[in-house]
Amino acid sequence: MQQPHIPVMLNEMLKFLAPKAGESYLDCTFGAGGYSKALLENCDCYVTALDRDPNVIKKAEEIKHNYKDRFDFVETNFGNCFAKLESKKFDGIVLDLGVSSMQLDIPDRGFSFLHDGPLDMRMSGQGLSAEEFINTAEEKDLADVIYKYGDETFSRRIAKKIVEVRKAARIDSTGKLADIVHSCIGFRKGKIDPATKTFQAIRIYINNELGELEQFLANVKNILKKDGRLVVVSFHSLEDRIVKNFFKENSEKPVARSKYAKEDIMLNPDKWLKIITNKAEIPSDKEISLNVRARSAKLRAAKKI
């Protein structure tokens, strides 16, 4: 059964994005439209939303019907959105990284081990599928992906078992892959399902999620107005590290070459961000109790200066 979509850290997103009437905002990860709708309801602002998943278009059309010219939707991944935005600039930009609840809850999408379905995991429906990767990749490559993107200690054991099983029969469903992982790692009381990290790792790899994030951040300066705010919600330590380092590298205070040097002689003259979250914001205990998917979320925000 598909669960109702609950936007993660919605109040915190609105707090740090601080929308104002007449301003324009970019929702880079539309999903079920939770952030876009909240922004449009908050004040008389304008929202452009992006998503590479064609399955969200119907939801986008519903919001377009209700908010008319205040809302636009562009079917694209955010890493390659710049040409399609046609030189638009925004007063605020928000990214809610990772997989959406809609994708997790539809078995045919193949994102979740909780529902048996085709082993797909492609957000756009194009390119290499998880099934193709699982059944053709070298054992070492499987282990590397599961370890790098899932931080899975038992990655080699899992990769070895995958190769062993696929020799007898193709691994073509989420249930089969989950069973393989479960056979390698026992369940521990109070811990997450043993298959969680492996599924996460394969999904991140298949959709080039970290590459998309890095590509977007490298170009975001060009579409953010002065004093515009950038808010990023991440769900994985690798995502959060990329965002944290990007904010730090572009917002460090000017450093003089020596204590006698003039202030305009700096090691970092190109800083353009001011961090407005001293450390990553995390969901409240109440939110986690209402939406377990929020448990690993971290929010960081910065302003263009």
Swiss-Prot record:
Main location: cytoplasm
UniProt xrefs under CDD domains: AdoMet_MTases
Keyword Cytoplasm: yes
Gene3D superfamilies listed in its UniProt record: Putative methyltransferase TM0872, insert domain, Vaccinia Virus protein VP39
Highest taxon listed in the record's lineage: Bacteria
Catalytic reaction(s) noted: cytidine(1402) in 16S rRNA + S-adenosyl-L-methionine = N(4)-methylcytidine(1402) in 16S rRNA + S-adenosyl-L-homocysteine + H(+)
Similarity comment text for this entry: Belongs to the methyltransferase superfamily. RsmH family.
Name the UniProt record assigns to this protein: Ribosomal RNA small subunit methyltransferase H
Organism: Rickettsia bellii (strain OSU 85-389)
Taxonomic lineage of the native organism: Bacteria, Pseudomonadati, Pseudomonadota, Alphaproteobacteria, Rickettsiales
